[in-house]
């Protein structure tokens, strides 16, 4: 048995870490030994930067474009991609079985995951990754500089022996990361660059609610923005509040993101509170103040306007 990508020729044709000017192509695979009823045993999702552009699962046996890519003609031969993913599914699940056999646990519930892909900057290859995990722990990864598979789990030593049984497999893995994957990414960008380079500014609202004890929670919500990077925090008397929790940035489900920050304010605190937002969609920072003159009840909304 050989690595998932190396067991058959690539069915994709040649091509005609992210920072500004960089693009990356990533594949995420998940295999389950005992999936819940109706849940696929194997799933694969491909991403261009942080945007999913096709999905495959073992229930349908089809690779299908998602989001705006479902409207793009000629980007991929989806029947050939489906064939490729079905072959990868079979090999991926065999690897999961081999690991379970090593640990003499052939009936347990286990998860095997893979991530591989590449990045280009200024139209040149600038990075790559290929690694696997078993039950959430690092299992094995490929070092393209050596090149070799590096075991990160006792069972992975056997996997390494199988995957390096012939030297050609190691060289093909290196070639995939350094040549084939970047060329594939360049080809996809011919259909995707305008979508990936777009800038959607956030819509910002502030809500307020009273909590037990009489204090009020101000919530500053930014949503519908792209790209993902955003700075969002509360200020009081021109000082950043360090005590509000970090909320992170979350996908909206439509290719954009949302984030929020909250602050607890006592009725006696009359200082002005501002929510400050920085995003590439704004030419300058957006500052939004809660209007204390409003006759507020629970969940009143203020829509942000640039100042």
UniProtKB/Swiss-Prot annotation:
Subunit-level organization: Interacts with PIP.
Lineage, uppermost ranks: Eukaryota, Metazoa, Chordata, Craniata, Vertebrata
Cystine crosslinks: 118-181, 220-275
InterPro entries with a match to the protein in the record: Ig-like_dom, Ig-like_dom_sf, Ig-like_fold, Ig_C1-set, MHC_class-I_related, MHC_I-like_Ag-recog, MHC_I-like_Ag-recog_sf, MHC_I/II-like_Ag-recog
PANTHER family to which the protein is assigned, alphabetical: MHC CLASS I-RELATED (PTHR16675), ZINC-ALPHA-2-GLYCOPROTEIN (PTHR16675:SF289)
General function of this protein: Stimulates lipid degradation in adipocytes and causes the extensive fat losses associated with some advanced cancers.
PROSITE patterns: IG_LIKE (PS50835)
Major localization class: secreted
Pfam families: C1-set, MHC_I
Native source species: Mus musculus
Protein name (Swiss-Prot/TrEMBL): Zinc-alpha-2-glycoprotein
Domain Ig-like C1-type, residue spans: 202-287
Signal peptide boundaries: 1-17
